[in-house]
Amino acid sequence: MARPAKALIDLDALRYNLKVAIDLSQYSKIMAVIKADAYGHGAIGVSKALSDNVDAFGVASIEEAIELREAGIKTPVHLLEGTFSDDEITIASKNNFSISCVNQKQKNAIIEAQISVPLNVWIFVDTGMHRLGITPEELISIYKDLSASDNVSDNIIIATHFSCADDLENDFTSTQLSRIKNAMKDLSVNTSFCNSAGLIGWPQTRADWNRLGIML
């Protein structure tokens, strides 16, 4: 019978990795992505180790967000995939979770929700990752609809996700950056483009927010 496997998480190493990220980010804010139990490292322990030096945590589900709050984490929490029911929108509003809007259905649900506290919304635009997000052509109309809603705070953020930023010889990251900038050229808003590979290898993509997971 094999011995049980044990993973030892070096929180000092995580803190050092975050310091490197902060130095690279300069004046950008940092969202530490800790979905899937911080990729198996333990979301609670990781979030407690990093909470003093990040601006937000990114998670995949409402359950992950609630887990952080119940553990006493006060740092802002963002739902990267948005919400999937009216109940989740209500919970996000009550707990001050920011949420993504990745399609027309989510946009309509946000606008039609019965909530008293406006939501901070990030609009994700699919510029080539093809995982989630609205099309670049939809951006202006969706932005206008959300901006006009009392359910949405004034600080809407526009985001995209790079598909191959870890390949420095593939210029598709530059193509994606051009697509998002063209789509939002008539908007004056905060933005979030960088994942870990983008922050390290493509400094021209650094924006108001950097969303970092693997490099931490």
What spans do the regions from the language model cover?
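Gly-rich Lys/Arg/Thr-decorated short loops/hinges at beta-loop-alpha junctions or inter-strand turns
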Residues: 1-3
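Active-site-proximal beta-alpha core segment in soluble small-molecule metabolic enzymes
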Residues: 5-9, 13-16, 28-193, 205-206
